[in-house]
């Protein structure tokens, strides 16, 4: 059986045949019985293939790129060098198609300690000498091929990025996308599926076709989507739970555009002191270079290159071996050993072997330091027999680190590695040549300028052309679309929306995660944003006044006070498909609105651009406009981008995904009493709506691209709701000010499904125990807002009168910048007056209490018993998956 065909457990353990191998520099104490045995095979003569045009094309290098490669080398490349250039000049590693766009992001702030593009993760000051390191990355293609391992190693990779910076990982978040998991898109009571609205046409496979509505899905596709969904969630749970990091927040969307190409974005946040920041730089000529972690195998071979090409059935099968295999228990040992090692001051630089493995870690550390690096592959622990230099350099076997040690302190380092029973080997040295030199069996197999492959890849200015389908999107109007009426229509619409898997409770997902480990979780999954407490034991051991890469000289300091950090991750792919600029703005606005609802203002952000091919002008336009929207949003909310990830070529034979520029925003809650959750608290509390009930300047009144339009009418079209960034920023600062002033008991933003869904969630989303919800009703009167007759033009206006407010727009429209808050009756007038004084519309709309949700409007009222709503919302996904 080949290595790539082994069962996952065997691949993770990597137990080779001892008779065929010889020992490396260090073997764990349990020797041959260890599942982490570190050994190397005897040298075997290998004939490298000739470099032909076909081989160059197979490595995804253009003729122009290959010519540039030869100019850099001044000769023909070796096969190993060809592989090195292939992965380092792939989009996944080089961002050659997106780097000009990324420069438009706001990246500066007085709080930024390590900025975008500098290191493995950004670092932001949170006061009292403490800082947080955070980042989001994708593992989309691997998860499409092997969902469990693809998702698991996505978590492992982002966790390594954090502790590589010298920070202790304290929480994880994820953002997931899949095709529909129900044939009709909606799961009803007792496992039945809801009634379907009018379906949109079958997907157009052209590069930039009209977005299609998600409810329609074939049974075979539904089963595949469920398999991918279950595998990804299981992989995330396995790695995070075993490592011991709480997964405290996330989002999951289901849409037809993600069939065959799921999105798996993993975020991690860690804590450190300012002086503990570690750099991934090969500093100090003559310093030894250590390899730490399990032996190198053929798993994950050229995974970075695989992630930089279209996902097809053929490529998925051919690249199954490019999916890495993770071992969270090994990662935990590596993490603890690295943090202990950093506290000694013996480390000059540290880098994880993530994308492109040993290749990326060596050339990037040398390039950052302006030095060179020389390694000997014979010293690299290997678990597969007869590995070539090409395979060793391009392998993405997990849980491996490259550590540059101050010369003369090798014994300290070895002692710590041995204490944690970790495999290690001294494989090279820092040089002054500026080149990455790789030797194998006594011969030089690669000799390349480090900066040329790490930082000087080709950069492309792609053509951007607006897709033709947007003309139809913008022309869509509500005339001819039946409005809901009170009674059966409104009742049925809300029930279907709450049962739609995209809106329904994600408890089937987060109950598989340990979100309480480390005892720092303050607000767990189920509210607008998660909140985590930074405790004293969250900070790694370290010495004040010195860098983690410099010698120590004093004892550690405990933090003077605990910090509360809020986190949210967001993106509405439908909005971005219909208007990528507005969709990009809305993604940042919702993430920041979720923080505000939790009592926090932003500190910084990290983005993950999940996009289709940049080679099609219509698709590159989507990328460009999405980035423009994100950039403007981050500027408006003072949420500088500290780093992130670009994942392009997300398209299957069925067509491209909806552009999905996911953004995670991190904020600071000043005091514990400011932490706010979304569920209603007490009978008799007053419900206040902050923000305009309906954007009457929008011809679609907030229904364009809405969940209501997709689920009830089977249409994914129309310009999405406008996001006025000034209005949104004013709302957020006003809301946080009201929370800090006292009196606000709950706050919940209005997003997918509109005001009616938001109010229902406030009634049914609180858990007082694991399986015990607390249901609390509300009576809401919206008769002052519509439906109503057309309002005349204001004096001096020449524009036509604005249209009447529709009932479906009032209940289910997704007009931006709205939050439902509650307070005691005595505080209501004060909150409304303060909000209006700040320029935020505010109105009393109802009262908390009872066992039903009642919504009144001018045309009548609709009532929903809460147990039925909770059953639909809570059990929709579990019924679909069972």
Question: Where would I find each of the regions flagged by the language model?
Answer:
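Intrinsic disorder/low-complexity segments
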Residues: 1-46, 184-219, 538-562, 769-772, ...
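Glycine/proline-enriched, intrinsically flexible loops and inter-domain linkers
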Residues: 45-188, 219-539, 562-792, 797, ...
């Amino acid at each position: 059986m080949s290595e790539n065909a082994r069962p996952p457990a065997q691949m993770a353990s990597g137990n080779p045949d001892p008779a065929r191998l010889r020992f490396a520099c260090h073997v764990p104490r349990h020797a041959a019985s260890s599942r982490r045995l570190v050994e190397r095979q005897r040298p075997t003569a290998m004939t490298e293939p000739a470099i032909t045009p076909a081989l160059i094309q197979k490595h995804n290098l253009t003729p122009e790129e290959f010519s540039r490669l030869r100019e850099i080398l001044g000769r023909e490349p070796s096969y190993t060098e060809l592989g090195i250039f292939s992965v380092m000049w792939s989009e996944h590693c080089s961002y050659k198609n997106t780097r000009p766009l990324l420069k438009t992001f706001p990246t500066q702030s007085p709080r930024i300690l390590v900025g975008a593009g500098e290191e493995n993760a950004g670092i932001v000051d949170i006061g009292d000498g403490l800082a947080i390191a955070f980042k989001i990355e994708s593992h989309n293609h691997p998860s499409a091929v092997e969902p469990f391992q693809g998702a698991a190693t996505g978590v492992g990779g982002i966790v390594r990025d954090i502790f590589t910076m010298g920070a202790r990982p304290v929480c994880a978040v994820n953002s997931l996308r899949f095709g529909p998991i129900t044939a009709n898109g909606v799961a009803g009571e007792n496992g039945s599926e809801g009634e379907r609205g009018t379906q949109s046409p079958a997907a157009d496979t052209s590069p930039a076709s009209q977005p299609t509505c998600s409810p329609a899905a074939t049974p075979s596709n539904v089963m595949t989507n469920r398999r991918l969904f279950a595998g990804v969630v299981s992989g995330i749970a396995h790695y995070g739970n075993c490592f011991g990091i709480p997964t405290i927040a996330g989002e999951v969307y289901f849409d037809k555009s993600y069939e065959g190409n799921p999105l798996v974005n993993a975020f991690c946040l860690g804590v450190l002191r300012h002086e503990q920041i570690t750099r991934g730089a090969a500093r100090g000529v003559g310093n030894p270079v250590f390899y730490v972690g399990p032996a190198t195998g053929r798993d994950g071979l050229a995974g970075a290159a695989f992630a930089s090409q279209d996902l097809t059935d053929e490529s998925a099968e051919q690249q199954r071996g490019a999916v890495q295999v993770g071992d969270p228990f090994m990662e935990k040992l590596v993490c603890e050993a690295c943090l202990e090692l950093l506290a000694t001051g013996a480390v000059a630089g540290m880098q994880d072997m993530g994308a492109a493995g040993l290749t990326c870690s060596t050339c990037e550390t040398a390039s950052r330091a302006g030095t060179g690096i020389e390694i000997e592959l014979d010293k690299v622990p290997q678990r597969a027999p007869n590995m070539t230099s090409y395979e060793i350099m391009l392998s993405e076997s997990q849980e491996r680190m490259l550590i540059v040690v101050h010369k003369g302190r090798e014994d300290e380092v070895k002692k710590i590695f041995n204490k944690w029973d970790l495999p290690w080997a001294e494989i090279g040295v820092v040089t002054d040549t500026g080149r990455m030199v790789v030797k194998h069996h006594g011969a030089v197999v690669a000799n390349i300028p480090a900066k040329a492959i790490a930082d000087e890849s080709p950069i492309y200015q792609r053509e951007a052309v607006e897709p033709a389908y947007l003309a139809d999107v913008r022309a869509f109007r509500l005339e001819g679309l039946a409005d809901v009426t009170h009674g059966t229509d409104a009742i049925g619409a809300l029930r279907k929306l709450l049962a739609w898997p995209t809106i329904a409770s994600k408890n089937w997902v987060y109950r598989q995660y340990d979100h309480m480990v480390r005892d720092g979780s303050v607000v767990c999954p189920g509210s607008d944003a998660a909140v985590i407490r930074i405790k004293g034991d969250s900070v790694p051991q370290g010495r004040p006044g010195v860098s983690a890469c410099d010698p120590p000289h004093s004892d550690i300091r405990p933090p003077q006070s605990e910090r509360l950090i809020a986190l949210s991750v967001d993106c509405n792919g439908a909005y971005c498909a219909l208007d990528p600029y507005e969709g990009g703005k809305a993604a940042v606005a919702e993430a920041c609105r979720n923080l505000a609802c939790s009592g926090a203002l932003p500190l910084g952000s990290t983005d993950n651009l999940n996009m289709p091919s940049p080679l099609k002008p219509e698709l590159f336009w989507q990328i460009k406009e999405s980035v423009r929207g994100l950039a403007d949003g981050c500027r408006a909310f003072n949420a500088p981008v500290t780093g992130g990830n670009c994942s392009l070529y997300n398209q299957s034979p069925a067509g491209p995904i909806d552009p999905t520029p996911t953004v995670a925003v991190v904020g600071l809650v000043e005091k514990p009493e400011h932490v706010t959750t979304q569920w209603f608290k007490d009978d008799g509390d007053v419900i206040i709506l902050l923000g305009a009930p309906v954007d009457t300047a929008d011809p679609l009144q907030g229904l364009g691209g809405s969940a209501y339009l997709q689920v009830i009418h089977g249409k994914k079209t129309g310009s999405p709701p406008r996001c006025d960034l000034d209005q949104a920023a004013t709302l957020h600062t006003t809301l946080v000010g009201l929370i800090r002033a006292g009196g606000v008991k709950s706050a919940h933003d209005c997003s997918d499904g509109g005001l009616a869904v938001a109010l229902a969630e406030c009634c049914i989303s609180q858990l007082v125990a694991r399986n015990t919800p607390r249901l609390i009703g509300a009576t809401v009167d919206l008769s002052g807002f519509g439906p109503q007759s057309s309002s005349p033009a204001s004096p001096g206006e020449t524009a036509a009168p604005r249209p009447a407010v529709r009932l479906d727009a009032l209940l289910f429209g997704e007009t931006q910048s709205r939050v439902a808050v509650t307070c005691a009756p005595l505080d209501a007038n004060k909150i409304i007056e303060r909000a209006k004084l700040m320029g935020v519309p505010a109105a009393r709309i109802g009262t908390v209490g009872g066992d039903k949700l009642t919504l009144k409007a001018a045309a009548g009222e609709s009532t929903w018993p809460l147990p039925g709503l909770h059953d639909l919302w809570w059990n929709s996904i579990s019924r679909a998956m069972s």
